[in-house]
Amino acid sequence: MWLRQSSGGGVASAGHGGPLRQRPIDAATDCDPRACYDSFCKHWQQAFEIIQHSAPPSHDDVLGVVSHLDYMVTLLLVELHHCNKVSLPAAEASGPPAAPCLEFLLSENLLDKLYEWACTTGRYANAVRLEQLKLYELLVSHSRHQLLCHEPFLRPLLKILASSQGEIFPPDLEKRLVILLNQLCVVLMQNVHLLDLFFFSAQTQVQEQILNGNVAPPKSGTTTNFIIFSLLIPYVHREGSLGHQARDALLLCMALSQKNSNIGTYIAQYSSICPLLVTGLGGLYSRLPNSIEISSIDWHRITPDDVTEIPELTLFMNALEFCNAVVQVAHEMIKQQLLDFMYQGFIVPVLGPAILQTLKGKHFQTNIDSQISAMSYLDLILRSITEPGLLRAFVRFLLDTEKFDGERILDALVERLNSPDANLCMVTMALFDTLLGLHCEDLMLELLLKFMLPGKHVPISHRHKINKIDPYLNSSEFFLDLSPDVMKRARDLARPKSVHEPVVSDLTPLPSLPSPVMSKTIGANWNYYGVHTGDSLYANIQAYLFEAHWRIAQCQRDCLKWANSYRYQKWPRHGQGRVHAHALELARQFFSEFGGGPIAANETGEKQLDSLQSIGESSGYESFKWRPADEESEATDTTLATTASEADLDHNSSSLSSVLGASGKREAWRTSNNNRNELILTDLDFSEDLFAQGTVSLGPFLNAIWGKLQTFTSNSLYVNLHLTGLITRLAWYPLPLIHSLLLRSDIAITSDTPSFHQVLRILKQQIDAELPVTEDSLEIIDVARSSLIDREFRLANARKGNEGSPMHHSQQQQMVTNSYATLSAATPVQATPTSAYDPFKRSDKKRRSISKSITSMFSRKSASTSTTPPNGSSASSGLSQIYAFFTGAASNLVGNNASNDGRGISQAQTSAGTCETSLSTQPQAGASRTGATATSAAASGSNSSIAGSTLTLSAQSNTTTHSASTLHGLDGGPSTGGFNSEPASLDSVASMGIIASTSGTERSRDLALCAVLMDEWLKELAAIAQEQSVVLVTEQGSL
């Protein structure tokens, strides 16, 4: 019988330290319980004989005991497998026990005897300890919490855990210890009443061990110790699975602190976990590369694949994720302490100098690469953390004026918007896109609202319109009319009359041109997914409205949590009568001095409107106007702020903990630090208003944005994408002040820089002048549209390939490569694997995670995975490309142009390193109402938009982008491992035979691309203006 054989030959056959489960005994083996019990007792008898007769144990003695323990563990496993319920020793138990081996183990106190002997094994102690940990791991995993209640099991377990403190173990022993501690944390999480069993006085617990000479005496002043947590702390920054298991167990302990205040007190007051986490985070940050390799013209932020490819960044993100999770689940004392340490020990001393690039308080010239990397790391951090407490700490860091010699981080970031370096500019705009996506009141107040609240940028005659929305005002037509003339003409020629978009009548008739029977590119005549090609780039207006509605609603929900409403207020609430009288007196003095006569006698019978300045395009002379009573009462009744009596929103406390730890129903980090009663506004300060018009500044942020917008036609493609996306994100805010600045065509703006609408008019005039409506211009426009549409379909097909089988993946990749060889021979289509690491995955509803399929579109790929098409095609007509699109083969309509074979395409793929970027049409949340292409940007908040579609380039940020028409960046390329990107202009397209007959210059081709992007962006602004009007009119009716 196998039991008898194992009983007699166990030592000889199993003393080589083999794995626990590599035994002839199987847990599922059908066996006799009595035979198992006899064999178990026999093995212990032999092991105990060795223990008793070994003065100092020799190598053979230790090997023999370990072998017997291995068999005993296996027999216990067999017994527990056949027992439905663990039976523990009982004095009055009748009948045979259900688990006789386990009962013998506990009744004979075997675990304690084994521990006492292990303390005498000297250099073999680790081998014996490993077997002990295996035994405890097995018993805990199968008995769960039942054994923890019994002293014969708990006492030796606490002894072995206490003796493990401060010890350095080999990797296999560390692994077993962490696994056991993790199992104990899981059991305690399910049985909170057992927590007190693992709190013990170190002096009392170790006293017996001191008498036996086993351990050193405890330090003076030792207090209650949570032994499990103490043992896990050294492994918090470990790499690999060991570190993950340790951090998981520590998080369980943090969650337990919410249920047991003793644990919270111990961790906050007696453990070193908070300073250890913060110092480790700072150390990991210092190991990050000072310069990120940028091999792409459109790179603007760190993606999940970048995190995976940079080991130092992976470790840093693991530590940051852990800190974020601790703040989320820990006790309030631990949370406040960690936030305090984070701010004082990492954010200010580590991130501050890195972003400001300072050395000993003095600025020094540094290269652009280090600035780009520091800002990219900050952007990654802001997109990764989700806890309001941490977010508030970073917001305070951006606005702090005391820590950096009076200089604010936010001001330094705004200055970099004006950087001539395109990469630094794009990274800065991506960072501001993330900041605006936080919907934080303090940030918006510092960037925009504090410059707009006085209302001095609006002529006095128009200020009463800020809060009052005219339901009959059609701002959409205003933006659509700003489209360049060549784009209007191209739409008229490229689409039938029956389209979803309303027809905009042109005031100036365009020159008549012959309508081509068939466009030379696929982008003008093919009907994709039920939407005409002319509306594939220029998406269905319903898609724009759907996107705008969802974005505005999301922003409105967050802004409702703000402390102030930020509606322009005509009269102050306090001292209203005195201010009114003082204003009238100033007006009388003004007329008596400059008007040449007294005020009319009938002024007492009517309400007089204050001084105003005429519309921005007029001569600027000031006049007076009589306003109806209902307008004044409307302006008077609008409220600026709610009451300031809520204690949870009092942000004037001087302590950091009170600022960082504000909690309640509102998200404190979104709420302003400013006292709401201090924001009392008036526009009747005649001493400044009447003589300062035209010199009002909108702040450095808007000035920088308008400055970049004025150079729209000379910017690179990707800078314009981020620029338009940033302005679009501002337009989503349902605040009357911002709405009046960006979307109201009936309100003039008087500031020291051209207004937004004036800049748009200038851009239209510039494009109309340099790109007149000619056949050559229309052909270049057609190519520009088609190239963007073409790239979107390549990305869409690559994504479908990633979602399917490997065979489908390969076929799809080859199909799109063949289909679009003509328009993008220099842009290889490469499907890329998904990243295993996703630091942006969240369960928080405010920060949606990025899907694996979308992430795969942005992952990098080596050259070995790219495919070379067997046959190249150089289609010169839309029909040939349509045929290739559906078949993946070269078109038979190409004729002599088929000489451009696959070898040429392969060479272009290897030499030109270009980034795949494209446009798609997609409604929000995958809705089919728009009939558009179902692709979306891999973005969590970065929406570099061009018109109805949030055009994004490899965007990864804090909210998921559901865009109507999105410009993606596919990070493919050669074996260098870097991003590849396409040229900013259409030179590569123009060099192909498709527009060989075009006589346009490089400047005209760049202007054509700008015209396409501007036309798309204006349609998005039109949709946002319409939706914002609906939202504000509805809100106005509810007041």
Curated annotation (Swiss-Prot):
Pfam family, one: KELAA
Ranges for region Disordered: 831-877, 904-945, 957-984
UniProt entry keywords in alphabetical sequence: Phosphoprotein
Residue numbers bearing the Phosphoserine modification: 498, 805
Domain of life: Eukaryota
Compositionally biased intervals (Low complexity): 925-945
Record-stated family: Belongs to the FHIP family.
Name of the molecule in the record: FHIP family protein GG24907
Organism annotation: Drosophila erecta
